[in-house]
Amino acid sequence: MKKFALFFIVLVSVFSLSAEAFLSVNDLESAKIVERVEFDGVFIVGAEGKHVTVEEADAKEAPDGEVFNLRIKLEGSGSAKHRHIELNAKKGETLKVYLISSGEDVRNLAVVNKDTGAEIGVLDAPGKNDSIGIASIEIPADGTYLLYSKNKGINIYLVICE
């Protein structure tokens, strides 16, 4: 019984240290998303005429050495209705997003509390001629959060909240 209790404590510890939300484009397949689609507890939400695309792309390397061969294209401005990524997060966790603008200019990825509609912050997506950016923000309260472009396209490669 003691061995089982010790195993249970270790198991709980491992799961409590794992990421609450994780989405890597490397785990996806090419697709045109026109509805709410779940990937291991994280949702990509598109709509007819306001779709999100997962597509193959030239390999891009992030500053930490992670290499991506696909990208999630938000395809333009998003909202609570479409063109967003949705995930659950807990107060105090850090949301980290690997991203880049689809244009030459820096673009803004809004992080919005789904329940209140409050924008908790903006993550900068570097211009497409730069390296993939890694932007992060601390989650202020338990809840569901939306990530969407405030203006024009942004490519997303990895979303992790831990």
Show the residue positions of the predicted features.
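Extracellular carbohydrate recognition and processing domains
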Residues: A118-D142
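Short beta-strand-plus-loop segments that form exposed binding edges in beta-rich domains
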Residues: L146-N155
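Short beta-strands within extracellular/lumenal beta-sheet-rich domains
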Residues: P63-K90, E104-R107, S131-A135, I154-Y157
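A mature extracytoplasmic/lumenal domain signature
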Residues: L99-G103, N151
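N-terminal targeting leaders for non-cytosolic proteins
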Residues: E20-G78
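Sec-dependent N-terminal signal peptides
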Residues: F4-V14
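Extended extracellular/luminal ectodomain segments enriched in beta-structured repeat modules
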Residues: N88-K96, G143
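Short, surface-exposed beta-strand/strand-loop-strand elements in extracellular ectodomains
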Residues: E104-E119
